[in-house]
Amino acid sequence: MTITFQDFQLSSDLTKAIKRMGFEEATPIQAQTIPLGLANKDVIGQAQTGTGKTAAFGIPLVEKINPESPNIQAIVIAPTRELAIQVSEELYKIGQDKRARVLPIYGGQDIGRQIRALKKNPHIIVGTPGRLLDHINRRTMRLQTVNTVVLDEADEMLNMGFIEDIESILSNVPAEHQTLLFSATMPAPIKRIAERFMTNPEHVKVKAKEMTVSNIQQFYLEVHERKKFDTLTRLLDIQSPELAIVFGRTKRRVDELTEALNLRGYTAEGIHGDLTQAKRMVALRKFKQGAIEVLVATDVAARGLDISGVTHVYNFDVPQDPESYVHRIGRTGRAGKTGMAMTFITPREKDMLRAIEQTTKRKMDRMKAPTLDEAIEGQQQVTVDRIRTIIEENNLNFYMTAAAELLEDHDSVTVVAAAIKMMTKEPDNTPVRLTEEAPLRTKRNKNHHHRSSKRRDGGGYRGKNNRSSYDKKRSSNDRRQKKSYNS
């Protein structure tokens, strides 16, 4: 039985936000968790990334927020700053119409800035364990008004040595509160947390959705970041797709890609979460009607799209997680038709390739990045195919006299070559500039150096000149990363 978000009878503010985000049908984890969350039940959810668990806990969490209150009403504890940022962005979108204030807090960010933000009375805090505990110990954040706690990816926090921090944080929350705990696995220490801090929790277990992709040809191209765009345009020239979707990881990427493709002579439109629903619908209508060749999209903007006839999907940026890859390529190969999906992998993203292959239970074939000569040959072949189609239509009587006159002065090969040259779209080398995106790594590799039984996220307050080595390391990494972006 299909459950839609209308079935949850949410407030008008949340209904508006969910509609804007493109949600229609609830995923299994959402269908089971949201009613329990709204009923104020404690929940243990076993679910992988990509199953929609952020909305599963985020919707009931935001629904219970009182926007008129100046107090912190909910905290979400996440293992990494990347996840904390991602979750806070999702919660902001869900709570936008309700005016729910969301604040992400994590190590590596200036603590003075965080303290100033905390004074602006956020309703929801999303943070990493060590930095949350740091603020508790500094007394810059008080949790006596918290009524909902979410532990996201609890097993990952256990692996990173955060279990003591989590227990300390939960000890500062009122006894009467709701806890939603999400974990892919349930090792003994996580079970102990559930026993100690949860009341008669309901268990929800959902496996990550596996999708059959037998009718989709899947390829990967190993290509450096700076060569991605030329590789994309050459593929478009060679393959000449009827309808193509290009996926970018960020809104900035989508905007820049759309502009660059149009500069190179392709007709492209971009869609992402910052565009109004009306603008997104206009772009989609043009795409369905064939008025544009390429639709450039983020994962969130493309969620729930139902477009028939998509022949090619280009993953310009590798997706955030393997399940998003499955959803992306599922835009093609529909209704029994075959489709083609190509994923650009930078040399430092090979671990993501393996993770995707494990999820789809299928190896991708390697495709060599095409050369400029191959792109020109591809466009010539498109022209030849068009000429053959026109010949087969046998509607050429009006042009026969002019053709005969040409053949009196030139041989047939020269005449045909001139026609092919005239009709062929020459590759456009107009310079374009895209902001480089940092390579995406699997969580296992991102956290490889941080796994131990010790706290890794800053611990408690040790005085203003005595930051933890982890925070110093994170700050150093931030500086290096910032430098690489600006170079």
From Swiss-Prot:
InterPro entries: DEAD/DEAH_box_helicase_dom (IPR011545), DEAD_box_RNA_helicases (IPR050547), DEAD_helicase_CshA (IPR030880), Helicase_ATP-bd (IPR014001), Helicase_C-like (IPR001650), P-loop_NTPase (IPR027417), RNA-helicase_DEAD-box_CS (IPR000629), RNA_helicase_DEAD_Q_motif (IPR014014). It is an enzyme of class 3 (hydrolase). Its EC number is 3.6.4.13. Its main location: cytoplasm. Residues 428-487 are annotated as: Disordered. It holds the Pfam family Helicase_C. GO terms for molecular function: ATP binding; ATP hydrolysis activity; RNA binding; RNA helicase activity; RNA strand annealing activity. Residues 441-454 have a biased composition (Basic residues). Residues 428-440, 469-479 have a biased composition (Basic and acidic residues). A motif (Q motif) lies at residues 3-31. A motif (DEAD box) lies at residues 152-155. SUPFAM superfamilies: P-loop containing nucleoside triphosphate hydrolases (SSF52540). Keywords: ATP-binding, Cytoplasm, Helicase, Hydrolase, Nucleotide-binding, RNA-binding, Stress response. It comes from the Bacteria. Belongs to the DEAD box helicase family. CshA subfamily. DEAD-box RNA helicase possibly involved in RNA degradation. Unwinds dsRNA in both 5'- and 3'-directions, has RNA-dependent ATPase activity. Oligomerizes, may be a member of the RNA degradosome. This is DEAD-box ATP-dependent RNA helicase CshA. It comes from Bacillus licheniformis (strain ATCC 14580 / DSM 13 / JCM 2505 / CCUG 7422 / NBRC 12200 / NCIMB 9375 / NCTC 10341 / NRRL NRS-1264 / Gibson 46). The gene is cshA.
